[in-house]
């Protein structure tokens, strides 16, 4: 990650933006968006995440966040890790997902190309945090 884009001050608000690998339009289905929202609620309740604004687009997410408890980089790491595993399972288990094989193939390809991952990558690595 660039030195320019980091969570430097935990007491400040940040605009963050993070996207699916290859800009896959994953969030055209409500069940996938619901996974993101449930996970955000968990982070609010258990990790002290404050969400001031959020927008789920078809291939990425924008948020304005702060924290009262855990460090923002740790919250986002855990959030993206959890949602990656949960979304992967939801895609695999969705009997009407016509794009299943294509999406999973691209995500596996991204994971193999990135030394930070073993075999699978759903989210791009960065959050592009900008202090407000």
Regions from the PLM with identified roles:
Residues 1-132:
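Short catalytic/metal-binding and nucleic-acid-binding patches
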